[in-house]
Amino acid sequence: MLCPGTLFKYAPQFDDLLVKLGKKIGKCQFVFFRQHPKWASILRARLEDSFKKAHLRADDYVVFIPWLNIADFYGLMQKADVFLDTAPFSGFNTAMQAIDCALPIVTKEGQFMRGRLASGILKRIALPELVTQTDDEYISLVARLVQEKNYCDQIRQQIIDSRNILYSDLQPIRTLEEFLINQLR
């Protein structure tokens, strides 16, 4: 499972989600990027503590890899089972890249805009079923995508079939233009 967000976005409450996912799914890996050594060491230490409290070894589940060039990054996204969006600070650029690679995203929608970026993308491409509201929903959905290949493949195909709307719909731009023009009057 790919965790490609900027490391500071992974709040401590996300640690427990990973532990619960590890327990539910069993043998699995959460792949993070070491873009900043200090942030990586802080996150790794936190995850080690969280997994240890659950009588699990973080090293059996958590992997930090070097930052990749764009071709390798897209290659990894195309091979991953699922993209775990950061909570409570959602990803946008990485979520768009995941959509480019037809990688299913699971997000937990936040209260504020910063926690609704990926959910906005998913809703726009008619995949609201990938947007969760609770930890239990998040865990169940991730487990289903990882354990049910047919379901995961169906979601991938839905992404492929609907992702062009994110690039070809000019209505949001026209709405913003209208708003800005009205503000100048």
Predicted regions and their residues:
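Conserved catalytic-core segment of nucleotide-activated headgroup transferases in glycan assembly
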Residues: M1-N69, Q78
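C-terminal amphipathic helix plus adjacent low-complexity
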Residues: G5-L7, K23, F33-H36, I42-S50, ...
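Residues in well-ordered alpha-helical elements
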Residues: P12, A71, D135-D136, L170
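Charged catalytic carboxylate motif
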Residues: Q13, L17, E137, T175
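Short acidic active-site motifs
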Residues: A71-F73, N93-T94
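Catalytic binding pocket for nucleotide-activated donors in carbohydrate/polymer assembly enzymes
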Residues: Q78, V82, T86-Y167
